[in-house]
Amino acid sequence: MYPAHLLVLLAVCVSLLGAASIPARPLNLYQFGNMIQCANHGRRPTRHYMDYGCYCGKGGSGTPVDELDRCCQTHDDCYGEAEKLPACNYMMSGPYYNTYSYECNDGELTCKDNNDECKAFICNCDRTAAICFARTPYNDANWNIDTKTRC
């Protein structure tokens, strides 16, 4: 093998190793956002739920600040249970990456029967949370709070 070929091969291997350390983008969260919009009939933008209280958004800890934050805590717990399912326990199959089939008809959410066990579980996690968000009051004072002091 020529030295130039070895350099190209080495460059490809290093690139692949670097790409392996880049986390995949959560695909399912887009669907979850659409479910939220369906359930609340578009009354509140999805981004308002991304940094609310102690549990809505990335991570979560402490005591939920209100009922809406409890919806997010329950959703986080549901995703945790999904990750324990054998059907969801393979690469890129967990709750953040697995997409599912559902329908939205005039605010009514239905997870379709063609979902496998993992997708059905995740769909129901998202459906339950979206319905909870729609029926629970939103307190602007709990958006973008200091989680280090309040949670």
Swiss-Prot record:
| Pfam annotation, one family | Phospholip_A2_1
What the entry lists under SMART domains is as follows: PA2c
GO cellular component entries: extracellular region
Which InterPro entries does the UniProt entry name for this protein?
PLipase_A2, PLipase_A2_Asp_AS, PLipase_A2_dom, PLipase_A2_dom_sf, PLipase_A2_His_AS
Just give the chief location class.
secreted
GO terms (molecular function) for this protein are:
calcium ion binding; calcium-dependent phospholipase A2 activity; phospholipid binding; signaling receptor binding; toxin activity
Where does the chain bind Ca(2+)?
Y55, G57, G59, D76
**What tissues has this protein been observed in?**
Expressed by the venom gland.
Cofactor(s) the protein requires to work: Ca(2+)
Q: Which residues form the signal peptide?
A: 1-27
Q: Where in the cell is it found?
A: Secreted
Is the keyword Signal in the record? Answer: yes
Q: Which reaction does it catalyse?
A: a 1,2-diacyl-sn-glycero-3-phosphocholine + H2O = a 1-acyl-sn-glycero-3-phosphocholine + a fatty acid + H(+)
Q: Which GO terms describe its biological process?
A: arachidonate secretion; fatty acid biosynthetic process; lipid catabolic process; phospholipid metabolic process; positive regulation of fibroblast proliferation
Q: Which cysteines are joined by disulfide bonds?
A: C38-C104, C54-C151, C56-C72, C71-C132, C78-C125, C88-C118, C111-C123
Task: Quote the cofactor binding remark.
Answer: Binds 1 Ca(2+) ion.
Which keywords annotate this record? Calcium, Disulfide bond, Hydrolase, Lipid degradation, Lipid metabolism, Metal-binding, Secreted, Signal, Toxin
Catalytic site positions: H75, D126
Q: What is its EC number?
A: 3.1.1.4
Summarize the protein's role.
PLA2 catalyzes the calcium-dependent hydrolysis of the 2-acyl groups in 3-sn-phosphoglycerides.
Which family, according to the similarity comment?
Belongs to the phospholipase A2 family. Group I subfamily. D49 sub-subfamily.
Output this protein's name: Acidic phospholipase A2 1
* Natural source organism: Tropidechis carinatus
